[in-house]
């Protein structure tokens, strides 16, 4: 269910396993995809400011979904960018909780650009694809990023490593 997103005032759909969205220009096809992305990722893929996608004269956009297993997800974004997230009617405070329930991947022309850019962009895309396949990957990825950041900080701020710093470096390397 989508309320007040661009040209979608009040829309309710019941998608099946595989769906094709068709319609004339300006009928809301992209807005529907944007609503799904907003629920999953907490942001629009078109604009960073909610006031740009919330319908005029409305205080907020709301997207609500019931997943196949009965789990309910909801997001409300207000014009001041404040956000309310709900999982099974309980307020949650971390977008990643909804993302784990409804992982999405936007494939558009910029996705193809990622493949031609540097290795960091490609790694980011691969990390996101792995997250889709194995959602337990996310906590491991967060821990890995933290270890890598600490290890690299040690290397960056130390020209000649002392014995203690070498031991610290070995522990970071072991964790990686």
Go through each PLM region and give its residues.
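Short, flexible segments with low predicted structural confidence
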Residues: 3-4, 8, 24-26, 96-97, ...
